[in-house]
Amino acid sequence: MITSLATTAPTQFLDVSGTRFAYRRFGIPAGIPLVFTQHFMGNLDNFDPAISDALARGREVILFDNAGVGRSTGTAPHTIAGMAADAGSFIDGLGLRSADLLGHSMGGEIAQLIALDRPDLVRRLVLVGTGPPRR
């Protein structure tokens, strides 16, 4: 049986403005972390562990459930802008000054809006199979 950091790292919880975000941190906790933003109908268990584990060999990786998704509480926003705002609040709640964002599909739209709305928070974007963001 193959074990994965993405699935064996403990799920933690962070309370931010009435939302309890579920997340996992793993890899090398030095430097700027890589935060994965969710694709449509996804949660922190839906990212390919082969990819997240490979990236975690050289840096810290953070997977999370956005508001109202998976193990996180709150109400899932009905807009990409709302999802981006919640994701930005989560990143702020972790106390990160800067992060690299990896977004696939809808997660790419979320990541782009965070970068547009909060350029101070985003160092780099990795966009996979996504298009321009919808507000």
Regions found by a protein language model. Give the residues of each.
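Conserved HGGG/HGGXW glycine-rich cap/lid loop of the alpha/beta-hydrolase fold
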Residues: V16-T73
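Conserved hydrolase catalytic core segment
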Residues: R97-R135
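Active-site loop/oxyanion-hole signature of alpha/beta-hydrolase fold enzymes
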Residues: I62-L102
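N-terminal cap/lid segment of alpha/beta-hydrolase-fold proteins
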Residues: I2-R20
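Short, well-ordered alpha-helices that flank and scaffold nucleotide-derived cofactor binding pockets
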Residues: D53, R57, S89, L116-D120
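Flexible, active-site-proximal loop/turn residues at the rims of small-molecule/cofactor binding pockets
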Residues: M41, N46, A76, A81, ...
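Alpha-helical elements of Rossmann-like donor-binding domains used by nucleotide-donor carbohydrate transfer enzymes
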Residues: A9, N46, A50, G82-S89
